[in-house]
Amino acid sequence: MSPAAAPAAAATAATVAPATATTVAAPSAFDLVADRARAGSYGPDPAGLRIALAFTTAQAVRHAGRAQGYRNEVLSLRLDAAVGSCAVEPGELPAGALDDCVGARVDELLDHPLAAVRVAALDAYLGHCRPHTSARGARTLTLPAGSSLEKSRARAAAVVRLLPLAEVRRVLVVGVVNSLLEQLRSSGAEYLPCDLKGGVTEWGEPVHADALARLDDCDAILASGMTLGNGTLDPLLAHARTTGKPLVLFAQTGSAVLPRLLGDGVSAVSAEPYPFFWLDGGPTDLHLYGGGAR
């Protein structure tokens, strides 16, 4: 299923501000980090760097013993040794997207009309300038070799440990990943599963299509990095900033971008740059930031 929060409903009535007041919308999470990148806060000028390689990865999976499967498609851009990625709905990318990226300057791609290109470009840039190292706060965990299901469960255990479960009653899960729900169940945690596509979980629980409508029913939020790619991260961030609720992100999309939001609404990140666990039966790495008991 596509991990995503549903867009907020439009207001039914406008509030007119006084003539002397100016209302300025807060920048989106993407714009906040991208503007810092353009200003040189993270390293070299993006205008001086070009993407050498663009590719997509598509997969379909249904693990043994599971009643449900899913499909994924990911756009990835390579900048020197770094690969930046953004998941998309299968078939969503237009035919010319890869050609747009190859040889293009990073600063140009940060303004590309496709959100997936913008996110993948920023992710590649930050993966190049801010790799996941202990000096930058990352705790690298190597997932052991195994089947896709074994590695999925190992990743889920690491991600769930980033939540302060002893302090929360119910977790809003934005992006249905069965191994994460399975880990929460085994931890005794209550959860509210949410995904734009709705449906039911592996255990027959209803999946809520509108995550924003359930924000007041949770004590913590566990969300996929795909929310950065489809633009639905911002209301989750706003809620976490306002309420102080833990917001933990598990990210293949934007894995180098989302750690830049730690302390600004985000309490922990599991960052998983390409190649992802499902591509390789051997050991692969997660980079963990923040998290645990507060």
At which residue positions do the language-model features occur?
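Electropositive, gly/pro-rich neighborhoods at or near active sites that engage anionic ligands
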Residues: 2-5, 21-178, 284
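Short, conserved loop/helix-junction motifs that constitute active-site signature segments
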Residues: 166, 215-216, 238-244
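Structural motif
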Residues: 170, 219-220
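A short acidic, amphipathic alpha-helical/loop segment
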Residues: 183-184, 232-239, 260-261
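A short helix->loop->beta-strand "cap" motif at the edges of active sites that frequently abuts
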Residues: 188-189, 242-246
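NAD(P)-binding Rossmann-fold cofactor-contacting core
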Residues: 188-201
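Short acidic low-complexity segments
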Residues: 205-217
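C-terminal functional extensions of proteins
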Residues: 245-294
